[in-house]
């Protein structure tokens, strides 16, 4: 068994995640091996920066295997994760003549992946798509699990669908082109997995020499943390594909993080930076409610900060915080649900948190 091939086992539409150095240079071969024939048109969706780095090489490789393929770039940045970008992809799909046998490839970070996935879910009522994530955050989180969406002015990811990719191909080499701020932001999601389900991963991340290797983009260390993160997510998604139960724990830090992203203006904080602050708030609430030890909370905060991530909450109007939280997808029957830690490697879902218990962190 190849330890860097991870199956996401679902009742329908199971698929493989392959992690391999250099895999981005052999996507044509990979597609043929999973049964995608070269009679299918392919539209690669990316952004200009990523396309300049990897697009031509990917396109040439696909053409080597006689695929008819083109690249279409959307604008980069969270503020462009919207219906306008979605429509641009639809227009490109129409111009290129994508039928129901066609394939979309998302080449880029989480924004490209989310928008492309939603385009695939909705173009001609659904066509296949592949994820080739190029950021750490998209590798360990958004490329796996089938959540696709665009933002609405009233909230993040409010317009979307659960729609699984046919495959995910991860090349750690692409991280060497990533700005260090974005790499560190991706580490927030890796730390999240340690807190919610994988104590061993958390302890691995705490060790100084491991942190040094990770931040220096050591290939073996990167593959290890990507692999462990995806295995945790795959397990959770396999138990609850549509987020009716346990999958909600993957949103640890996200309720407060989305508030910060929205109210500070998309782009002021990177997604992972906002999530790191959200985890800090959730940890503090848990400490106050005696759900976990103060020592655990301090360990979490120290780990977050050791990877260069923020923990200081920005000043935000309390009324606006409630407005955004009540529009959150995790609200059920008018009640806000929060993911709070009970120990390193264990969290639970709570709906009995009073407003006063979290609003004070936004003073």
UniProtKB/Swiss-Prot annotation:
Superkingdom to which the source organism belongs: Bacteria
GO CC, alphabetical: cytoplasm
Keyword Cell cycle on entry: no
Pfam families for this protein: DHQ_synthase (PF01761), DHQS_C (PF24621)
Keywords: Amino-acid biosynthesis, Aromatic amino acid biosynthesis, Cobalt, Cytoplasm, Lyase, Metal-binding, NAD, Nucleotide-binding, Zinc
Reactions catalysed: 7-phospho-2-dehydro-3-deoxy-D-arabino-heptonate = 3-dehydroquinate + phosphate
Matching InterPro entries: Dehydroquinate_synthase, DHQ_synth_AroB, DHQ_synth_fam, DHQS/DOIS_N, DHQS_C
Binding positions (NAD(+)): 134-135, 147, 156, 174-177
Co-factor binding comment: Binds 1 divalent metal cation per subunit. Can use either Co(2+) or Zn(2+).
Cofactor or coenzyme needed: Co(2+); Zn(2+); NAD(+)
Pathway(s) the chain acts in: Metabolic intermediate biosynthesis; chorismate biosynthesis; chorismate from D-erythrose 4-phosphate and phosphoenolpyruvate: step 2/7
Protein EC: 4.2.3.4
Cellular localisation: Cytoplasm
Single annotated GO MF: nucleotide binding
Top-level EC class as recorded in UniProt: lyase
GO biological process entries: amino acid biosynthetic process; aromatic amino acid family biosynthetic process; chorismate biosynthetic process
Binding site for Zn(2+): 189, 254, 271
NCBIfam families noted in UniProt: aroB
PANTHER family reported in the protein's UniProt record: 3-DEHYDROQUINATE SYNTHASE (PTHR43622), 3-DEHYDROQUINATE SYNTHASE, CHLOROPLASTIC (PTHR43622:SF7)
Cited HAMAP family: DHQ_synthase
Biological role: Catalyzes the conversion of 3-deoxy-D-arabino-heptulosonate 7-phosphate (DAHP) to dehydroquinate (DHQ).
UniProt similarity note: Belongs to the sugar phosphate cyclases superfamily. Dehydroquinate synthase family.
Protein's name according to its UniProt entry: 3-dehydroquinate synthase
């Amino acid at each position: 068994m190849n330890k860097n091939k991870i199956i996401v086992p679902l009742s329908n539409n199971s698929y493989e995640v392959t992690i391999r150095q250099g895999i981005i240079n052999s996507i044509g071969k990979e597609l043929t091996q999973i049964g995608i024939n070269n009679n299918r048109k392919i539209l690669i969706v990316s952004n200009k920066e990523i396309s300049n780095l990897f697009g031509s090489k990917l396109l040439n490789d696909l053409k080597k295997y006689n695929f008819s393929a083109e690249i279409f770039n959307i604008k980069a940045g969270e503020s462009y994760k919207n219906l306008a970008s979605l429509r641009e992809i639809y227009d490109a799909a129409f111009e290129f003549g994508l039928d129901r046998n066609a394939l979309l490839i998302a080449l880029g970070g989480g924004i490209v992946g989310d928008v492309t996935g939603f385009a695939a879910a909705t173009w001609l009522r659904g066509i296949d798509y592949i994820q080739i994530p190029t950021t750490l955050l998209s590798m360990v989180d958004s490329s796996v699990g089938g959540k696709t969406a665009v933002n609405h002015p009233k909230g993040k990811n409010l317009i979307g669908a659960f729609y699984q990719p046919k495959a995910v191909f991860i090349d750690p080499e692409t991280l060497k082109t990533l700005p260090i701020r974005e790499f560190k932001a991706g580490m927030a999601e890796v730390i999240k997995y340690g807190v919610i389900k994988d104590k061993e991963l958390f302890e691995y991340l705490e060790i100084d020499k491991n942190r040094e290797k990770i931040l220096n983009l050591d290939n073996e260390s990167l593959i290890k943390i990507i692999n462990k993160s995806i295995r945790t997510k795959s397990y959770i998604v396999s138990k609850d594909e549509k987020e009716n139960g346990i999958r909600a724990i993957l949103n640890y830090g996200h309720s407060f993080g989305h508030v910060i992203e929205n109210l500070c203006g998309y782009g002021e904080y990177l997604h992972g930076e906002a999530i790191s602050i959200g985890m800090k708030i959730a940890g503090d609430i848990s400490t106050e409610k005696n759900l976990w030890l103060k020592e655990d909370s301090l360990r979490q905060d120290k780990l977050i900060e050791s990877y260069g991530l923020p923990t200081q909450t920005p000043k935000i109007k309390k009324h606006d915080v409630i407005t955004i939280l009540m529009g959150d997808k995790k609200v059920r029957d008018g009640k806000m649900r929060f993911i709070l830690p009970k120990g390193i490697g264990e969290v639970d879902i709570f709906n009995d948190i009073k407003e006063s218990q979290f609003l004070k962190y936004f003073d």
